[in-house]
């Protein structure tokens, strides 16, 4: 889905714009996170390749946000070695080397900014208020039937994670129970012994779900 590729860019606007107020709609100088990102790009020389441009975006966003966004961009795949041909409004080459990734990581770390104190990768339009207030999770009850989970009366959950015995995520689901108090989601893979389910708050705190 081409629109899924836009999600990380919108999440940055949701958090830095809607949660932190860094948007032209709220700043008296009509600046903001994205306006400042665009201005930086406008006033600096273009990089030669798409891979360089993609990875430089990680540095620029961290610089403008005054936050270490390496974890966020790593989870979205920006800092993954790749060498492919992309057909999107025309055909082009996308190459990201490990050396370039290491360079960007070093430059971002050298900025000295703290990491966000939220699970930025899980913010959605529906959870903006959770990220503003950062309430703790209120546990409800949960049942499982095969690979389908039903969560009842859980509150302040940004997302649910299903992880395997190594801690690798095998399923992630939206945590909000709107408009009812019950949410149901189904994994694409079969449930296995050793799998665990966690409710994740806006701050990234995890609460184990028991059945």
Predicted segment positions?
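Active-site-proximal alpha-helical
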Residues: 1-85, 97
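Beta/coil-rich, acidic/histidine-enriched accessory regions frequently appended to metallopeptidases
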Residues: 49-210
């Amino acid at each position: 889905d081409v629109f899924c590729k836009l999600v990380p860019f919108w999440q940055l606007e949701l958090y830095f714009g809607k949660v932190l107020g860094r948007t032209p709609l709220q700043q008296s100088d009509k600046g903001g996170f994205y306006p400042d990102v665009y201005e930086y790009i406008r006033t600096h020389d273009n990089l030669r390749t798409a891979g360089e441009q993609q990875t430089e975006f990680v540095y620029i966003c961290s610089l403008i946000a005054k936050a270490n966004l390496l974890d966020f961009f790593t989870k979205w795949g920006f800092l993954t070695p790749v060498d492919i041909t992309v057909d999107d409004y025309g055909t082009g080459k996308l190459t990201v080397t490990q050396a370039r990734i290491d360079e960007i990581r070093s430059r971002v770390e050298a900025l000295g900014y703290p990491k966000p104190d939220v699970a930025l990768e899980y913010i959605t339009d529906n959870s903006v208020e959770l990220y503003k207030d950062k309430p703790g999770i209120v546990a409800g009850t949960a049942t499982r039937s095969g690979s389908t989970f039903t969560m009842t009366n859980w509150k302040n959950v940004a997302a649910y994670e299903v992880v395997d015995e190594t801690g690798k995520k095998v399923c992630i689901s939206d945590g909000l129970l709107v408009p009812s108090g019950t949410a149901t989601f189904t994994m694409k893979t079969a449930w296995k012994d050793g799998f665990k389910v966690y409710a994740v708050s806006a701050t990234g705190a995890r609460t184990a779900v028991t059945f």
